[in-house]
């Protein structure tokens, strides 16, 4: 304190101090030790800003969380409203949304899908904590729908006799639940054929499944 009887503490002065007070007058002097306790004041940490993100289904991406504490306290991270397949390990957020993350569940989403605008937003809260202080940020991650090509299951070669009728019955489906159409090319352009004498031989027919965008 010196001789001014004043002390303006800083954030680094937390602790217990013994202060000697000396009183002196005409013909006497007196010393006394006074215990002074400076309580710690925990300062707010600094949480670096996280921007909103736009990603695609089946695309893995990461967010590196960064925060600092002016008192050099240890900083931990947590998150609220995490999607089921997302992971936060220490300060690294990792997510690879599956192809089923964005779905057509209403008239609006079906209309958006028609114009290839289908997406879904996820509001995730990230929290940085140190000692008695914490700070949070809400981040919107928008996942865009990714179309997958229709699937045609393999089928065994077809063998018929001359004058027999042929009917092709492919097993085809769309993993996104879209309607599909089938077309045929090569030896025939439809799914049926009536063979004639003289048709003996090996022929190839190409079956194509399309959802209007992918095949």
Predicted regions mapped to residue ranges:
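Strand-loop-strand motifs at the edges of beta-sheets in extracellular beta-sandwich domains
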Residues: 1-9, 85-112, 185-196, 206
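A short beta-strand micro-motif common to beta-rich folds, especially ectodomain repeats
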Residues: 15-25, 105-130, 201-211
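Extracellular acidic, Ser/Thr/Pro-rich low-complexity tracts
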Residues: 25, 67-71, 130, 172-176, ...
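C-terminal edge beta-strand
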Residues: 28-39, 133-144, 214-215
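Proline-centered linker/hinge motifs at extracellular inter-domain junctions
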Residues: 42-46, 75, 86, 147-151, ...
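Surface-exposed, proline-enriched loop/turn segments that connect beta strands in immunoglobulin-like
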Residues: 48-52, 82-83, 153-157
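A short beta-strand segment in extracellular, disulfide-stabilized domains
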Residues: 60-67, 165-172
């Amino acid at each position: 304190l010196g001789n001014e009887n004043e002390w303006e503490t800083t954030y680094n002065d937390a602790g217990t101090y013994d202060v000697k007070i000396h009183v002196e007058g005409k013909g006497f002097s007196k010393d006394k030790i006074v215990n002074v306790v400076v309580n710690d004041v925990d300062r707010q940490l600094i949480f670096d800003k996280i921007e909103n993100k736009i990603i695609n289904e089946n695309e893995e991406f990461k967010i590196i969380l960064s925060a600092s504490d002016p008192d050099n306290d240890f900083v931990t991270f947590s998150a609220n409203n995490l999607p089921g397949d997302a992971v936060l390990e220490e300060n690294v957020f990792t997510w690879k949304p599956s192809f089923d993350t964005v779905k057509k569940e209403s008239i609006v989403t079906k209309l958006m899908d028609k114009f290839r605008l289908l997406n879904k937003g996820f509001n995730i809260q990230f929290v940085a904590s140190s000692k008695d202080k914490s700070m949070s940020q809400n981040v919107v991650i928008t996942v865009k729908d990714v179309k997958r090509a229709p699937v045609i299951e393999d089928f065994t070669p077809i063998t018929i006799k001359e004058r027999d009728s042929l009917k092709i019955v492919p097993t085809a489906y769309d993993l996104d639940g879209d309607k599909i159409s089938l077309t045929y090319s090569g030896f025939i352009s439809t799914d049926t054929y009536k063979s004639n004498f003289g048709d003996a031989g090996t022929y190839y027919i190409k079956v194509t499944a399309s959802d209007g965008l992918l095949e």
